[in-house]
Regions:
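Cyclic nucleotide-binding regulatory module and flanking cytosolic helices
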Residues: 1-39, 89-92
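Glycine- and acidic-residue-biased ligand/ion/polar-headgroup-sensing regions
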Residues: 41, 52-65, 80-82
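Short phosphate-coordinating micro-motif centered on Lys-Gly-acidic
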Residues: 44-49
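Cyclic-nucleotide recognition modules
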Residues: 77-134
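Polybasic "coupling" helices that flank or enter modular domains
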Residues: 105-107, 123-188
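Phosphate-/nucleic-acid-contacting segments
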Residues: 164-228
Length: 228
């Protein structure tokens, strides 16, 4: 495959529909793709801003969340390098109407695809359209899982799920994260998270240290996460 632009290889790897595009569609997608950088803490998307576009993360981390009128937020999901943020271009999905906020949790490098061009490709190419709806369904599945935990699960089980999920990403036993960060990502009060961590430490499941947690008994946490 001849390289159409410096971004063609990244787009080809990220999007399963790439080979189903015509050469003209591939060229158009590349032409309206640009590199973007978001500093840690930067606002990427909000309901008050225009449609950002589809983001293909190359490095860093984005957090998607809802914000209440009194300033309380609930983290819905996080995205990491290699993942695609489609709800930053929710304007291309006529059936999606959600007041979503997206912030950069770390310095983030990404490729941004024009929302208008992506909408055109969705209308022209059934493979692009199917991909967009599949990705949107996956993000809403993540959102429903988060809401299910908040509404129906006990605090200790939610914390066990969070710890096991985070460690699964790294394959280690240490999680370098403050109690405030854990509470933010879980949609819980900091006091609740601190109390549960202290309980886990008393049981010998974790060791607490400044700025992090070391898991000592992963099997116990996994059993609690499963509701056993």
């Amino acid at each position: 495959m001849a390289e159409i632009s410096p971004h063609a290889r990244c787009l080809a790897c990220a999007f399963p529909f790439w080979e189903q595009l015509t050469p003209e569609e591939q060229e158009r997608l590349c032409r309206f793709t640009r590199p973007v950088h978001y500093a840690k803490g930067a606002r990427v998307h909000s309901p008050l801003e225009s449609c950002v576009g589809i983001l293909l993360l190359r490095s860093g981390q984005l957090r998607s969340y809802l914000l209440s009128e009194d300033g309380r937020d609930v983290t819905l999901y996080r995205l990491f390098g290699g993942e695609v943020c489609i709800l930053s271009a929710s304007c291309v999905m006529d059936a999606v109407n959600i007041d979503l906020y997206i912030d950069a949790e770390e310095d983030t490098e990404a490729l941004c695809i024009s929302a208008g061009i992506f909408r055109q490709l969705m209308q022209e190419n059934v493979y692009v359209r199917c991909y967009a709806y599949q990705m949107t369904a996956e993000r809403f599945s993540d959102t429903m899982w988060t809401m299910q935990q908040i509404l129906f699960m006990s605090a200790d089980r939610r914390l066990a799920i969070f710890l096991t999920d985070e460690l699964a990403k790294t394959g280690g036993t240490d999680l370098r994260m403050t109690h405030d960060q854990m509470a933010k990502y879980m949609g819980a009060a900091r006091e609740v998270v601190s109390r549960m961590l202290k309980y886990f430490a008393q049981e010998g499941w974790v060791r607490l240290y400044r700025g992090g947690v070391q898991v000592l008994d992963k099997k116990k946490l996994q059993a609690l996460a499963r509701g056993e």
